[in-house]
A protein has these predicted regions:
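N-terminal catalytic cores of NTP/NDP-binding nucleotidyl/phosphoryl-transfer enzymes
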Residues: 1-30, 36, 59-74, 182-183, ...
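Conserved active-site neighborhood of enzyme catalytic/cofactor-binding cores
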Residues: 2-9, 107-112, 237, 260-271, ...
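Catalytic alpha/beta core of large soluble enzyme barrels
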Residues: 7, 200-294, 298
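Residue patterns forming the tRNA-binding/recognition surfaces of aminoacyl-tRNA synthetases
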Residues: 28-178, 264-376, 383, 390-393
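Amphipathic alpha-helical
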Residues: 130-163, 191, 196-233, 373-402
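A short catalytic or substrate-binding loop motif that flags glycine-/basic-rich loops and adjacent residues
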Residues: 160-164, 185-188, 229-233, 242-244, ...
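A short acidic-Thr-Gly-centered motif at the start of a beta-strand
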Residues: 167-176, 240, 258, 405-409
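Conserved phosphate/anionic-ligand binding catalytic regions in large, soluble enzymes, centered on
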Residues: 178-200, 345, 351-358, 416-430
């Protein structure tokens, strides 16, 4: 591209935080900082000896305080706009590395580095509200059509996974509603059971045997897959069908995906293959509500005329979708919604070698970001890995601080940011690497947006 006359930015940098560096440092009895900087020094010398035409004046390292200062500043800006939050969440827990793993880091049910059997565990995690941008992300894919391979655009659309449907509220005999998501409200009268995910909040209302079953189910690899044989357990609790007022059983099932929709689905075995397989296995009622003269299949998933559907009988199923939606909205038992497979991004990790999250927990119960004048919040150098896990959690002084605004005692957040957080923005920092007044300075305007990024 230089030979074609284009201005080419060819920088070099080091994606230097993370679990691999931390583990390697521990194995070599060095601090992660010394281990990482030593490796960077060696690699820099090797690359320079090869004569690559990198712009070394733009060199950055993600573990540099000058770099992660702006990452912390950005986190605080997101916090101010309510785009980051903390909640208890079911995660992939590596019992050897003592940290959360992303789904991509779990291979055949085992940790990608440790080889440990991954456990499902609920812990408090920080999340980035990527779901707030689901519609924008999907819409912007149209700008790639004709410029990117069709399979890449399709893959992205499927990853975001937009679904039009409805949320319906089912009352239960223990006075707690269960909300289900469905893309087929026209099959509402065919519901003969409800299935919930093993981590659904409703499980807390169940007996100890159900809770133990769910814990075991969550630790099975099959729980994260849509394929495989159906498996479930009756909770002993019934819901009330919002239309027919019949009692329908509530089951835990392995084919209800955790983290998608509401974590609860309505079982319509005559018109959904998974529901049908589940109903056959556990001898549950099968109610046909859509007829089609062209097929006598046990499971019909297409369109047709409604039957066994009260006042909606004989309606075409496509028309019935709107009619039933209007009815449930009028009766205040449901609403029309868009759902997405895209989930909010869990960005915190229970390890030392990462960017400190600039949050404090004040003694009066307030959770708030540090004052921006305190940035960067630096990692301590005097760390002890002998106790295992995250040494920040056990540090005798670093985690204890005071709120600058009130003077009240506070404890620092001891989780650090996922390394993908660092690598999500360094391409922009390359364009103004030495700016000490802003995350991305005016110098970047010359380069951004780029025509080609490799």
């Amino acid at each position: 591209h230089r030979m074609l006359g284009d201005n080419v930015l060819h920088p070099i940098g080091w994606d230097a935080f993370g679990l691999p560096a931390e583990n390697a440092a521990i194995e070599n009895k060095l601090s992660p900082k010394d281990w990482t900087n030593s490796n960077i020094k060696n690699m820099r010398e090797q690359l320079k000896s090869m004569g690559f035409s990198y712009d070394w004046d733009r060199e950055i390292s993600t573990c540099s305080e000058n770099y992660y200062k702006w990452e912390q500043w950005f986190f605080i800006e997101l916090y101010k706009k309510n785009l980051v939050y903390k909640k208890e969440s079911l995660v992939n827990w590596d019992p050897i590395d003592n940290t959360v793993l992303a789904n991509e880091q779990v291979i055949d049910g085992k940790g990608w580095r440790s080889g440990a059997d991954i456990q499902k565990k609920k812990i408090s995690q920080w999340f980035l509200k990527t779901t707030s941008y689901s519609e924008d992300l999907l819409g912007d894919l149209t700008e790639l059509e004709g410029h990117w391979p069709d399979n890449v655009v399709t893959m992205q659309k499927n990853w975001i996974g937009e679904s039009d449907g409805a949320e319906l509220s089912f009352k239960t005999l223990i006075n707690e509603d269960i909300v289900v998501f469905t893309t087929r409200p026209d099959t509402l009268f065919g519901v003969s059971f409800i299935c919930i995910a093993a981590d659904h909040s409703f499980i807390e209302k169940c007996n100890i045997d159900i809770k133990a079953y769910c814990e075991n189910l969550l630790n099975k690899e099959s729980n994260n897959k849509e394929q495989g044989s159906p498996e479930g357990l009756f909770t002993g609790i019934y819901a009330i069908h919002p239309m027919t007022k019949k009692q329908i059983p509530i089951w835990v099932a392995n084919y209800v995906l955790t983290g998608y929709g509401t974590g609860a689905v309505m079982g319509v075995p005559a018109h959904d293959q998974r529901d049908y397989n589940f109903a056959l296995k556990y001898d549950l009622e099968i109610i046909k509500v859509i007829s089609n003269d062209d097929t006598d299949a046990e499971v019909y998933t297409g369109n047709g005329k409604l039957i066994n559907s009260s006042i909606f009988n004989n309606l075409d199923s496509k028309i019935a979708v709107k009619s039933i939606l209007d009815f449930i909205v009028e009766k205040n038992v449901g609403k029309s919604v868009k759902n997405y497979k895209l989930r909010d991004w869990g960005i915190s990790r229970q390890r030392y070698w990462g960017c400190p999250i600039p949050i404090i927990y004040r003694e009066d119960g307030e959770i708030l970001p540090v004052d921006e004048t305190e940035l960067p919040i630096k990692l301590p150098d005097d760390i002890d890995f002998s106790k295992g896990g995250n040494p920040l959690e056990n540090h005798p002084t670093w985690k204890y601080t005071k709120c600058k605004k009130t003077g009240l005692n506070a404890i620092r957040e001891t989780d650090t940011l996922d390394t993908f957080f660092e690598s999500s923005w360094y391409q922009s920092r390359f364009c103004s690497p030495n700016d000490d007044k802003s995350m991305i300075g005016d110098e970047a305007n010359y380069w951004l947006p780029v025509d080609i990024y490799i």
